[in-house]
A protein has these predicted regions:
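Short, glycine/charged-enriched secondary-structure capping and boundary segments
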Residues: 28-31, 73-75, 96-99, 145-146, ...
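Active-site-adjacent mobile loop/cap segments within catalytic or ligand-binding domains
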Residues: 14, 20, 25, 82-87, ...
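A short, glycine/acidic-enriched catalytic loop
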Residues: 22-35, 89-122
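Long, well-ordered alpha-helical scaffolding segments within enzyme catalytic domains
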Residues: 42, 46, 52, 109-124, ...
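A short, hydrophobic beta-strand-centered structural micro-motif
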Residues: 71-87
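Surface-exposed patches in mature extracellular/periplasmic domains of secreted proteins
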Residues: 58-64, 125-133
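Active-site histidine-acidic residue metal-binding/catalytic motifs
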Residues: 2-71
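Loop/turn elements at helix/coil->beta-strand transitions in domains of secreted/extracellular proteins
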Residues: 10-11, 51-57, 77-82, 122-126, ...
Length: 189
């Protein structure tokens, strides 16, 4: 029987695809004909399928422009793990994958490292590392207000030519890597 971070029998995961549904009013970062909201939604939906197939309970997969709504939904679902999927951007001058966790959360850091390792290994992206978000400095709302062990995955840079091609053609591989990272975490990475 599977054990989860809260000691229950099945790990419960809540997925959040970054930015507004259909890009209205905020599509997130854009580049090379891609919109962050679309890539994030596609990848999150694929992750949900892979996790379900692996016996992990997906208790939500929400895309909303309201971060409060996202956090409330995750907390109401009593999720053990919260994963927010995004794409990064930096005027085409950076590339790679990074995964954020709430600063000081050892479980969040462990989950982030499991996912980061899987993505970098599977897709060969530049490993920009695992980063801790500090409230008042670079605290990401979903990480600091979610009860679950929480991470925010920046898949790759949507405005970098090479990364954008991966985001366009390898969404399934990104999703598999995230799902593998979750199951690695469940097994203590």
């Amino acid at each position: 029987m599977r054990r989860n971070a809260k000691g229950g029998s099945t790990m419960k995961v809540f997925l959040n695809a970054g930015h507004a549904p259909d890009g209205n009013p905020d599509p997130g970062a854009c580049g090379y004909g891609l919109r962050e909201c679309d890539v994030a939604k596609n990848v999150a939906d694929l992750v949900a399928g892979y996790l379900t197939a692996a016996g992990v309970e997906v208790v939500g997969c929400l895309q909303s422009d309201s971060l409060r709504e996202v956090v409330s939904a995750s907390n109401r679902a009593d999720a053990d793990v919260f994963i927010s999927v995004h794409c990064n951007a930096c005027n085409g001058s950076a590339n790679g994958t990074e995964t954020w966790h709430y600063y000081g959360s050892t479980e969040g850091e462990k989950l982030a490292q499991c996912i980061q390792n899987q993505i970098a290994d599977a897709l060969g992206t530049v490993d920009r590392g695992v980063k801790g978000a500090k409230p008042g400095v670079n605290g990401l709302y979903v990480l600091s207000n979610t009860d679950a062990v929480a991470v925010l995955v920046e898949l790759a840079f949507i405005d970098h030519a090479g990364d954008a091609e991966l985001l366009r053609s390898q969404q399934d591989e990104f999703a598999r890597a995230i799902a593998c990272g979750v199951t690695d975490y469940e097994g203590a990475c």
